């Protein structure tokens, strides 16, 4: 199943939790700890690394300091170094959040097997964590283990049914195994939680189209467009459905919008030309088809030969 949907939806909860407990620290270490936290919270991750490193020099067996330095390094995309810090924290004092964040960082390095292993370990601390099941499900999907991913998303929902993203991700997977009604149910559930979920409208529209419910599909594309009026793909897909319903003028309006967003889109000119041809606007149709050809959409020339040049020959006769 293509995982490209997951790119639009997949939304890992990459939260690097900061433990504000400061027991067991000397006064000087506490200051470095606090300065590290302040730097981290203000987005100064390199400074945070420096402060946490100084704190570690004074207390090299404090697991929390390695965890925090790992968080800062992960923010800097120093993923291998972050993983080493989380690993040290785990060796010193295994905690759920250490495994969780190392698992999330393994995802960043595309080491999905180790990520899943870390989420398994984290779940031993809390088997009711919806977030952990979500993250493991996401990783399973990236690994191509779709059945396991669906099970994990279902577990996540059983522990917390208020997260629209989980429904969207599970709906994507149902779609991939052609369980279209289940996919529609999940996207509808997501929209009941978040009526501004553009991706849920978009995905549900595609599912409606697959089962022949074209009006519902057009309606959902329209709602997605309201939320994101510059997404060219939405107009293309809605336009295609309108053409299928012989709503050529309305479809032409969608292609006109695409052209306003992407003036060099040869496909949009071609499609609009076909729409114009179907409503007997021959001059406009041929102008668009010629423009499509100029922009590299070479299929247009065959239509020009059969439609536009044929009309010219008739006029000459």
For each of these PLM feature ranges, what is it?
Residues 2-6, 13-15, 19, 23-317:
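Alpha-helical tetratricopeptide repeat
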């Amino acid at each position: 199943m293509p995982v490209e949907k997951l790119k639009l939806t997949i939304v890992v909860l990459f939260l690097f939790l900061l433990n504000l407990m400061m027991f067991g620290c000397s006064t000087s270490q506490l200051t470095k700890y606090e300065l590290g936290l302040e730097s981290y919270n203000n987005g100064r991750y390199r400074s945070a690394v420096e402060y946490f490193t100084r704190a570690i020099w004074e207390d090299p067996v404090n697991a929390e300091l390695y965890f925090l330095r790992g968080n800062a390094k992960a923010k800097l995309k120093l993923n291998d170094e972050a993983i080493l810090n989380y690993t040290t924290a785990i060796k010193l004092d295994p905690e759920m959040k250490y495994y969780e964040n190392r698992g999330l960082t393994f995802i960043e390095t595309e080491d999905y097997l180790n990520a899943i292993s870390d989420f398994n370990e984290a779940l031993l601390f809390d088997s009711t964590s919806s977030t952990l099941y979500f993250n493991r499900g996401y990783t399973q999907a990236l690994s191509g283990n779709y059945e396991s991913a669906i099970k994990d998303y279902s577990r996540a929902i059983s522990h917390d049914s208020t997260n629209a993203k989980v429904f969207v991700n599970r709906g994507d997977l149902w779609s991939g195994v052609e369980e279209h009604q289940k996919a529609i149910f999940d996207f509808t559930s997501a929209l009941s939680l978040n009526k501004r979920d553009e991706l849920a409208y978009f995905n549900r529209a595609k599912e409606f189209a697959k089962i022949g419910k074209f009006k519902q599909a057009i309606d959902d594309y329209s709602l997605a467009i309201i939320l994101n009026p510059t997404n060219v793909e939405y107009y293309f897909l809605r336009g295609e459905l309108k053409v299928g319903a012989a709503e050529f003028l309305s479809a032409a309006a969608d292609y006109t919008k695409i052209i306003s967003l992407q003036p060099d889109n040869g496909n949009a000119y071609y499609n609009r030309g076909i729409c114009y041809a179907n409503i007997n606007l021959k001059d406009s149709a041929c102008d668009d088809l010629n423009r499509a050809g100029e922009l590299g959409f070479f299929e247009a020339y065959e239509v020009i030969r059969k439609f536009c040049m044929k009309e010219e020959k008739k006029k000459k006769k």
